[in-house]
């Protein structure tokens, strides 16, 4: 048995948790939309063709915001194709994912569906093949009440009330050579600045996300962020980060240490934002939108064999295992540790495509192992992020040194009078953890949720639910706080409630 210590103090404040860090992403890609959220012939389809069983699972996650419609798809998308009578909409080749897009689901259908699952939409505008004009028209179509061409067109389509979308993305991964309309940092920065300016003239209340690097391994990483922000700093509110992790080498200790890479990534981009703030003598602070993150590697080879140019092309259908859930938990913890700067995050994606939810055409929908840490954080991680002081045994691995076996984040809700400790034990031994609580003397343990499994590669399928959490965690109140026993390789959620 290993031992660790943790101090949780009410005054060790990181910042308020923006609920949007528990966001997700749905792209017109694979079976995310068609055969995912939308399947008119399914027994569970509602009057609009959207699957009610999928809606129920999304509601369990309490997803606050969903990025839409892409993704690489975005850079070749004409939003006008997806509005108006469905029978008049064109079928287009989506060059990003080699599919045929029917445009059955477009802006109004998706925004109406979002209301059904109680979420907001983070709408993205195409800065690949389109630009300023298409972007400002989309804002007018979505957000202007009436009396103009585009707002009245929306009303003529049967949607009288404006949507009031508050969060918008200025393109997608424009630094990537694979992107339709790929640009240099200066080219993108100028276009993004002018587009942002005009979009905010249409609706001054909106917030805008500029494209950061596609990932931290890009050769122009950091230089891209600095140049883009020098053009856009006074016109945007966030810059994006995208990152995915995998365990191709089947090296578990190294894989679980990847949360340290995310920590470094966040710090690097935040520092770059602050450098540009100083350079431009600005008084505003640009925060971060981690609007694509997840585990992604299981499906890579299988995707090469899928027939091109069909609709609902089954690609990126990663089947996640228990070790993936542990890393997703650690990545969520890392975001909470940076709640002062990370204000938006989107688990990419939500249904079928590298997703916590999987569906069968005409059949069931089910929860993958990564569903659970994401749900726990979203449901219980609302409030103020506190900085726990952790003394834990450490280990070295291929790419990292001094990796703590215990990774933890703490969220305090003054309104709900709850304290929630999220912790991952990365050790293959039980971890006895003494937790000192300062300022929470009247709090008692309400629940200790654990996600664990003897087989690190265990998966869930529609007929086999192997990886599910339980509430039989071992923790007890001690003289100065509590003692928690974290089982080997486990995700833990300890919920405490103030006693009257």
Swiss-Prot record:
Its main location: cytoplasm. Disruption phenotype: Cells lacking this gene retain 38% of arabinofuranosidase activity, and the double mutant abfA/abf2 is inactive. It is found in: Cytoplasm. The record marks 296, 349 as: Important for substrate recognition. It catalyses: Hydrolysis of terminal non-reducing alpha-L-arabinofuranoside residues in alpha-L-arabinosides; (20S)-ginsenoside Rc + H2O = L-arabinofuranose + (20S)-ginsenoside Rd. One of its GO terms (cellular component) is cytoplasm. Optimum temperature is 50 degrees Celsius. Optimum temperature is 35 degrees Celsius (at pH 4.5 with pNP-Araf as substrate). Its EC number is 3.2.1.55. Keywords: Carbohydrate metabolism, Cytoplasm, Glycosidase, Hydrolase. The keyword Hydrolase applies. The active site is at residues 173, 292. At a concentration of 5 mM, K(+), Cu(2+) and Ni(2+) exhibit inhibitory effects on the activity. Additionally, the chemical reagent SDS also displays a certain degree of inhibition. Enzymatic activity is largely unaffected by product feedback inhibition. GO terms for biological process: arabinan catabolic process; L-arabinose metabolic process; polysaccharide catabolic process. Pathway: Glycan metabolism; L-arabinan degradation. It is an enzyme of class 3 (hydrolase). GO terms for molecular function: alpha-L-arabinofuranosidase activity. PANTHER family: ALPHA-L-ARABINOFURANOSIDASE C, ALPHA-L-ARABINOFURANOSIDASE C-RELATED. Homohexamer; trimer of dimers. This is Intracellular exo-alpha-(1->5)-L-arabinofuranosidase 1. It comes from Bacillus subtilis (strain 168).
